Amino acid sequence: MTGPRVFMVAAEASGDLLVREVVEELRRRSPDAHIAGIGGQELASVGIESAIDISPLSILGFFEGLKAYGDVVRLADEAADAIVADAPDVVVLVDSWGFMLRVAQRVRLRAPDIRLVKLVGPQVWATRPGRAKTLA
């Protein structure tokens, strides 16, 4: 019997730390799991090479975010392509609300049968309550 096929996605340092912990636990519980992903140094530290370079997403501030919008859209497309090509059973999207929403939308369009899980959702109560509807 083969283990689950899991694709992890983290686009910022805090998410990358969480992904590392999830990968370590998943390997402990299911040693035959196939795990691929997109992330940074923490993901690499557990032996998973990032499918795409996410360094352009390391942005701070409103104006820097506006300048990087084209990169966000391009990387969301590249991430979705990598996910669909890997054909996982489940994708775990960690943190980075805006980027992960774009990735999730693209994956749903290209491969609607792939299950998507959001780990560390946005603080709906602290930001925009309308996000709760989008998450559901």
What name fits each language-model region?
Residues 4-136:
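Active-site and donor-binding regions of nucleotide-sugar-utilizing enzymes
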